[in-house]
Amino acid sequence: MAPNLRKSHPLLKMINNSLIDLPTPSNISAWWNFGSLLGICLATQILTGLLLAMHYTADTTLAFSSVTHTCRNVQYGWLIRNLHANGASFFFICIYLHIGRGLYYGSYLYKETWNTGILLLLTLMATAFVGYVLPWGQMSFWGATVITNLFSAIPYIGQTIVEWAWGGFSVDNPTLTRFFALHFLLPFVIAGLTLIHLTFLHESGSNNPLGLVSNCDKIPFHPYFSLKDILGFMLMFLSLTTLALFSPNLLGDPENFTPANPLVTPPHIKPEWYFLFAYAILRSIPNKLGGVLALAASVLMMFLSPLLHKSKQRTMAFRPLSQLLFWTLVANLFILTWVGSQPVEHPFIIIGQLASFTYFTILLILLPITGALENKMLNY
């Protein structure tokens, strides 16, 4: 009998072992769909981004006009731009749900997979930030100014780093051209990191909702989960096209319809919605360096998750106290996101400070203590 090409060809064999004959736990739920959705998001963003880059000019005098030209005069340029801008939002929705799943079901105990995942999140955040600057609207310009300025809080070398990043003494043409170069490059870095992420994942196999070893009950990825993933793709594309066609500017800032002007500061400088939780944490500390450290800690703290796992059970499926804390954390993140979008005045300042304090307390103190407490309760 002739050998099956899918199982013998060096390249096809790798694809087969990753996407076709991959042994998969039979009980993984829809929460395990977001990894493949993130892959589709990345492919969509690279494709639409490439088409946009063909019509974009990375120059301060022409950037805004070139984006306008794309939307008005290029065939379906408006659609490509709307899909790209809103695709970024869906990318972040998927990655936040993917991380939430990891925290809830103890997936962070696969340390290498988890750590590469955090690196992926950081790279995605960097990509989205430099991408937001490219249309060269008011919020693009002032967002770039404010966020890059945070590096000046680093003692001794901070100011030098900022001027080096800007390519001058303010955000200007050199900044825009290098941000375009970075925005083109970073998605391919994300693609490379994704392959590393998957390599580490396939070393151990997937976790599952029960957190039990599932070697005795695995099924092939195709056709079962390939079909399930296609359903996920369809639902996501339906949501994305609905948003891009019916309300493309829902998540954007009206300020960005005004070309960048260094002489006029917008009344409220705020990032896109997916950074608001971190922005609220940054603003809640009335000291520049302290705020920057809190901002960095809000994401980098996830590297500690595997070390702070004190429970004898892997997932939160049978741990009601930890579940309560987890959903409190989710609600807290919604509050932080809302506060980040509000002006810096009386009720919002204190709400932001309390929510920031709660965020760190739950992750660093309450979850490990609760895990240890639940271990004690197992004895009774």
Curated annotation (Swiss-Prot):
<dbReference type="InterPro" id="IPR005798">
    <property type="entry name" value="Cyt_b/b6_C"/>
</dbReference>
<keyword id="KW-0349">Heme</keyword>
<keyword id="KW-0813">Transport</keyword>
<dbReference type="GO" id="GO:0046872">
    <property type="term" value="F:metal ion binding"/>
</dbReference>
<dbReference type="InterPro" id="IPR027387">
    <property type="entry name" value="Cytb/b6-like_sf"/>
</dbReference>
<dbReference type="GO" id="GO:0008121">
    <property type="term" value="F:ubiquinol-cytochrome-c reductase activity"/>
</dbReference>
<dbReference type="InterPro" id="IPR048259">
    <property type="entry name" value="Cytochrome_b_N_euk/bac"/>
</dbReference>
<keyword id="KW-0812">Transmembrane</keyword>
<dbReference type="GO" id="GO:0006122">
    <property type="term" value="P:mitochondrial electron transport, ubiquinol to cytochrome c"/>
</dbReference>
<dbReference type="InterPro" id="IPR005797">
    <property type="entry name" value="Cyt_b/b6_N"/>
</dbReference>
<keyword id="KW-0479">Metal-binding</keyword>
<keyword id="KW-0830">Ubiquinone</keyword>
<feature type="transmembrane region" description="Helical">
    <location>
        <begin position="114"/>
        <end position="134"/>
    </location>
</feature>
<feature type="transmembrane region" description="Helical">
    <location>
        <begin position="289"/>
        <end position="309"/>
    </location>
</feature>
<keyword id="KW-0249">Electron transport</keyword>
<keyword id="KW-0472">Membrane</keyword>
<feature type="binding site" description="axial binding residue">
    <location>
        <position position="183"/>
    </location>
    <ligand>
        <name>heme b b562</name>
    </ligand>
</feature>
<feature type="binding site">
    <location>
        <position position="202"/>
    </location>
    <ligand>
        <name>a ubiquinone</name>
    </ligand>
</feature>
<feature type="binding site" description="axial binding residue">
    <location>
        <position position="84"/>
    </location>
    <ligand>
        <name>heme b b562</name>
    </ligand>
</feature>
<feature type="transmembrane region" description="Helical">
    <location>
        <begin position="179"/>
        <end position="199"/>
    </location>
</feature>
<dbReference type="InterPro" id="IPR036150">
    <property type="entry name" value="Cyt_b/b6_C_sf"/>
</dbReference>
<dbReference type="GO" id="GO:0005743">
    <property type="term" value="C:mitochondrial inner membrane"/>
</dbReference>
<keyword id="KW-0496">Mitochondrion</keyword>
<dbReference type="Pfam" id="PF00032">
    <property type="entry name" value="Cytochrom_B_C"/>
</dbReference>
<dbReference type="InterPro" id="IPR048260">
    <property type="entry name" value="Cytochrome_b_C_euk/bac"/>
</dbReference>
<feature type="transmembrane region" description="Helical">
    <location>
        <begin position="227"/>
        <end position="247"/>
    </location>
</feature>
<feature type="transmembrane region" description="Helical">
    <location>
        <begin position="78"/>
        <end position="99"/>
    </location>
</feature>
<keyword id="KW-0999">Mitochondrion inner membrane</keyword>
<keyword id="KW-0679">Respiratory chain</keyword>
<dbReference type="GO" id="GO:0045275">
    <property type="term" value="C:respiratory chain complex III"/>
</dbReference>
<dbReference type="InterPro" id="IPR030689">
    <property type="entry name" value="Cytochrome_b"/>
</dbReference>
<keyword id="KW-0408">Iron</keyword>
<keyword id="KW-1133">Transmembrane helix</keyword>
<comment type="similarity">
    <text>Belongs to the cytochrome b family.</text>
</comment>
<protein>
    <recommendedName>
        <fullName>Cytochrome b</fullName>
    </recommendedName>
</protein>
<dbReference type="Pfam" id="PF00033">
    <property type="entry name" value="Cytochrome_B"/>
</dbReference>
<comment type="function">
    <text>Component of the ubiquinol-cytochrome c reductase complex (complex III or cytochrome b-c1 complex) that is part of the mitochondrial respiratory chain. The b-c1 complex mediates electron transfer from ubiquinol to cytochrome c. Contributes to the generation of a proton gradient across the mitochondrial membrane that is then used for ATP synthesis.</text>
</comment>
<feature type="transmembrane region" description="Helical">
    <location>
        <begin position="348"/>
        <end position="368"/>
    </location>
</feature>
<comment type="subunit">
    <text>The cytochrome bc1 complex contains 11 subunits: 3 respiratory subunits (MT-CYB, CYC1 and UQCRFS1), 2 core proteins (UQCRC1 and UQCRC2) and 6 low-molecular weight proteins (UQCRH/QCR6, UQCRB/QCR7, UQCRQ/QCR8, UQCR10/QCR9, UQCR11/QCR10 and a cleavage product of UQCRFS1). This cytochrome bc1 complex then forms a dimer.</text>
</comment>
<feature type="transmembrane region" description="Helical">
    <location>
        <begin position="321"/>
        <end position="341"/>
    </location>
</feature>
<dbReference type="InterPro" id="IPR016174">
    <property type="entry name" value="Di-haem_cyt_TM"/>
</dbReference>
<feature type="transmembrane region" description="Helical">
    <location>
        <begin position="34"/>
        <end position="54"/>
    </location>
</feature>
